[in-house]
């Protein structure tokens, strides 16, 4: 019971997770700054080398190597080992592959490799240089997981693998992304830094100007590369290598021959084809992956009239033909994860190689001295050969002979052992000369090794020579092109849209669609698809390059490029705004719709039930960032019950406002100030407490009509309402009754001396070939009445007009509209 400890769960969890975090940081996800390898990679290379699975020998089953690695060094499951082995064999992931593999080792399309029982692997030749001299006590070893074998904590690394092949990984609280580089350039930078330990970053970048991805591509942003090499963090643009190829018949196609690092080619081709299918950019006929064993090739065939550069710019901006690569150079340095720059990486590598060369030299020197001691003994034996032979013959056994040699001639234990095991053929004159030559060579070697150990300059010369040998053997041209500046991709949005004729329709309830001229002309206007309780308020022919603005009764404006509207048949109901506009309210209705070619110029006037009015500029309605999902305000309403009564382009000088209680006010539109979208406007008419605005319209004719809720209708002259100033009460256009008083339901101009297009503030529905303006009235009992407004006689200002039906007064008006 004494072994039981009482500890809080918080302490236990914190301490255990700290241990776990330290383990996965140091032993799993991050590379060592010296050899650039993660533990699993190091174990794979060491185990394969230990088993003799090297480049000069035949391939072996991957499963055998994986089993040995898992059983001896890495007990974390065969998949993680095989996955790491496969990655080290993929020439599109590594600048210099460390494992050669026969069979399916995956692809740039993200295809999985074949199972390890089918593939074969061996170390690549350059991987041997990472392990070179490991048998000479050059690196420290540690016990494996079950203390049965020892494994290296770092490899000798005869070339700077961390920079050459890069690394990526995610750990607890740390992540790393180090790009691969060109072997020749890295070695040149190391050699220069050996000669100039305090070399500036600018000077080093003359030798190592930037990453070199195995997939090629174009790297843009010299300043960001410098920042990354200085701080360990930075971001560059990596762009595909493309060219425009001419085809027969004046067509063109975009050819992609190199794609950004770590981009899945199959996913990229699919995304480009999605652009074609969804017609996000017109002009793409077909997307083909024509890659084969000769190299990568993606063909994007274009229509004859297509703008190839605009399409390419769009694809660069909205697909992975161009990506950002983020440097995050984190590596384990003295058992600690650190954000490191180029100078730190190079200096750490040089320091590591210094240790390796010195330890190797000490090992070789000790071995040479041991051999020299033996050779000296053998040469001495040859000068007293007869005595030695006689002594050995007189000895009882090998041990006695060795002891006699040591006592009689002062030979050491090692020399005595070499003498008694010497074969007789070695006593010829030829072997005497050979021993003398070997003695001289050993003395020269020991002198050289002593110089390396004792003289830093000599040691660094050896380091440089060995690096140059690696460069000479494995150097290859740079694959990625470096460009100093990141090019800003500018896309002419208009040029991306195929200009087509279409018909746009909008209902009051918020349904909209575009319809092809063929479908529109094949149906009558009345066959439009809509809900029974909805009303078509807008139909107009337009081009797909134009823009649709929808103004609602709640003071919101909705923007839609016409090419983004759903293309449906005329008889289809259309798409409701609530499907895309998150803030479209249930009680909200479309008040006015307008199609514009541009937002350069144009004014609108808005009038609310509370009698406020304002003008605002169309420029302020230029598409906002969230237009696809949210509307924006064009007028601020005074309260929740307030509504916009009229929204119209400013066409004429005078405006006429008519209130529910029958007051009419006429004033110049120039009195209305131009204000921002968020303002509520200014007072247009001075309302009584129980009054509200019923209608507002521009004065475009000589007369206007007034319809009351009881179904009484009259037509009166505009001149009966003389022009005055804004914010007045106005004149009564109805006579007040004590019982069943009339209240204005709708008022508007009567078309007589102007066109319907100029008059109509509420709809642009194409008129039939008639000069008559009709007022359609629907009673609450469902009765429909149509009145030709021009046939009405002019009435006095104070009259209440005439009922449109003998029974309408008892039913009251439900809906009224002009057409």
Curated annotation (Swiss-Prot):
One of its GO terms (cellular component) is extrinsic component of plasma membrane. Residues 30-496 form the Topo IIA-type catalytic domain. Coiled coil: none annotated. SMART domains: TOP4c (SM00434). Its EC number is 5.6.2.2. GO terms for biological process: chromosome segregation; DNA topological change. It is found in: Cell membrane. The record marks 38, 74, 76, 87, 93 as: Interaction with DNA. InterPro entries: GyrA/parC_rep, Gyrase/topoIV_suA_C, Topo_IIA-like_dom_sf, Topo_IIA_A/C_ab, Topo_IIA_A_a_sf, Topo_IIA_dom_A, TopoIV_A_Gpos, Type_II_DNA_Topoisomerases. Keywords: Cell membrane, DNA-binding, Isomerase, Membrane, Topoisomerase. It is a peripheral membrane protein. Gene3D superfamilies: 3.30.1360.40, DNA gyrase/topoisomerase IV, subunit A, C-terminal (2.120.10.90), Topoisomerase II, domain 5 (3.90.199.10), Topoisomerase, domain 3 (1.10.268.10). It catalyses: ATP-dependent breakage, passage and rejoining of double-stranded DNA. The record marks 117 as: Transition state stabilizer. Pfam families: DNA_gyraseA_C (PF03989), DNA_topoisoIV (PF00521). Topoisomerase IV is essential for chromosome segregation. It relaxes supercoiled DNA. Performs the decatenation events required during the replication of a circular DNA molecule. PANTHER family: DNA GYRASE/TOPOISOMERASE SUBUNIT A (PTHR43493), DNA TOPOISOMERASE 4 SUBUNIT A (PTHR43493:SF9). This is DNA topoisomerase 4 subunit A.
């Amino acid at each position: 019971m004494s072994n039981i400890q009482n500890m809080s769960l918080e302490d236990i969890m914190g301490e255990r997770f700290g241990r776990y975090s330290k383990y996965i940081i140091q032993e799993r996800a991050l590379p060592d700054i010296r050899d650039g390898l993660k533990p699993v990679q190091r174990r794979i290379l060491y185990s394969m080398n230990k088993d003799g699975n090297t480049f000069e020998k035949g391939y072996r089953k991957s499963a055998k190597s994986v089993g040995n690695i898992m059983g001896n060094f890495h007990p974390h499951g065969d998949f993680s080992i095989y996955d790491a082995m496969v990655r080290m064999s993929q020439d599109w992931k590594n600048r210099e592959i460390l494992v050669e593999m026969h069979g399916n080792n995956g692809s740039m399309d993200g295809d999985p490799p074949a199972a390890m029982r089918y593939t074969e692997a061996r170390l690549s030749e350059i991987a041997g240089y990472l392990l070179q001299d490991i048998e000479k006590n050059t690196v420290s070893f540690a016990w494996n997981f079950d203390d049965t074998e020892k494994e290296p904590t770092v490899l000798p690394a005869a070339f700077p693998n961390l920079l050459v092949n890069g690394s990526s990984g995610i750990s607890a609280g740390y992540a790393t992304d180090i790009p691969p580089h060109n072997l020749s350039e890295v070695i040149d930078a190391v050699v220069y830094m050996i000669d100039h330990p305090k070399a500036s970053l600018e000077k080093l970048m003359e030798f190592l100007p930037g990453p070199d991805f195995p997939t090629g591509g174009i790297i843009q942003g010299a300043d960001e590369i410098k920042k990354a090499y200085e701080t360990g963090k930075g971001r560059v643009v990596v762009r595909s290598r493309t060219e425009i190829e001419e085809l027969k018949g004046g067509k063109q196609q975009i050819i992609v021959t190199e794609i950004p690092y770590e981009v899945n080619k199959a996913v990229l081709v699919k995304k480009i084809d999605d652009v074609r299918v969804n017609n996000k950019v017109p002009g793409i006929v077909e997307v083909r992956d024509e890659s084969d064993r000769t190299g990568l090739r993606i063909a994007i065939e274009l229509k004859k009239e297509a703008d190839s550069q605009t399409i390419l710019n769009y694809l660069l901006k909205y697909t992975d033909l161009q990506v950002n690569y983020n440097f995050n150079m984190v590596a384990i340095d003295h058992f600690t994860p650190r954000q490191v720059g180029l100078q730190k990486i190079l200096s750490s590598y040089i320091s590591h190689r210094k240790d390796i060369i010195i330890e190797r030299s000490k090992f070789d020197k000790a071995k040479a001295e041991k051999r020299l001691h033996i050779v000296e003994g053998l040469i001495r034996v040859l000068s007293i050969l007869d005595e030695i032979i006689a002594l050995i013959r007189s000895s009882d056994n090998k041990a006695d002979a060795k002891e006699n040699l040591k006592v009689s001639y002062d030979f050491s234990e090692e020399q005595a052992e070499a003498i008694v095991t010497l074969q007789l053929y070695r006593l010829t004159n030829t072997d005497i000369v050979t021993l003398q030559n070997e003695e001289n060579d050993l003395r020269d070697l020991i002198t050289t090794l002593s110089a390396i150990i004792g003289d830093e300059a000599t040691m660094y010369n050896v380091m440089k020579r060995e690096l140059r040998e690696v460069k000479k053997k494995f150097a290859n041209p740079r694959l990625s092109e470096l460009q100093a500046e990141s090019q800003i991709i500018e896309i002419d949005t208009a040029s991306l849209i195929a200009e087509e004729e279409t018909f746009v329709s909008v209902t009051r309830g918020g349904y909209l669609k575009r319809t092809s001229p063929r479908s529109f002309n094949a149906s009558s206007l009345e066959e439009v698809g809509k809900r029974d309780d909805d009303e078509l308020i807008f139909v107009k022919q337009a081009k797909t390059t134009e823009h649709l603005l929808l103004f609602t009764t709640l003071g919101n404006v909705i923007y839609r490029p016409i090419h983004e509207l759903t293309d449906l048949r005329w008889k289809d109901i259309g798409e409701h705004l609530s499907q895309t506009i998150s803030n479209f309210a249930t009680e909200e209705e479309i008040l006015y719709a307008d199609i514009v070619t541009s937002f350069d110029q144009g004014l609108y006037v808005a009038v609310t039930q509370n009698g406020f009015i304002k003008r605002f500029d169309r420029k302020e309605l230029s598409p906002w960032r969230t237009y696809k999902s949210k509307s924006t305000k064009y007028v601020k309403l005074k309260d929740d019950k307030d509504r916009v009564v009229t929204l119209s382009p400013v066409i004429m000088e005078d405006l006429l406002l008519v209130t529910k209680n029958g007051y009419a006010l006429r004033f110049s539109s120039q009195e209305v100030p131009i204000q921002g979208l968020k303002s509520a406007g200014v007072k247009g008419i001075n309302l009584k407490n129980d009054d509200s605005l019923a209608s507002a319209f521009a004065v475009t004719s000589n007369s206007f009509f007034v319809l009351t809720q009881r179904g009484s209708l009259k037509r009166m002259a505009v001149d009966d309402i003389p022009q005055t100033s804004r914010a007045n009460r106005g004149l009564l256009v109805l006579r007040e009754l004590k019982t069943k008083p009339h209240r204005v339901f709708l008022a508007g101009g009567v078309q007589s001396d102007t066109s319907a297009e100029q008059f109509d503030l509420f709809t642009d529905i194409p008129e039939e070939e008639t000069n008559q303006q009709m007022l359609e009235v629907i009673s609450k009992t469902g009765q429909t009445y149509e009145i030709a407004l021009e046939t009405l006689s002019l009435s006095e200002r104070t009259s209440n007009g005439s009922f449109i039906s003998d029974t309408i007064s008892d039913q009251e008006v439900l809906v009224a509209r002009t057409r």
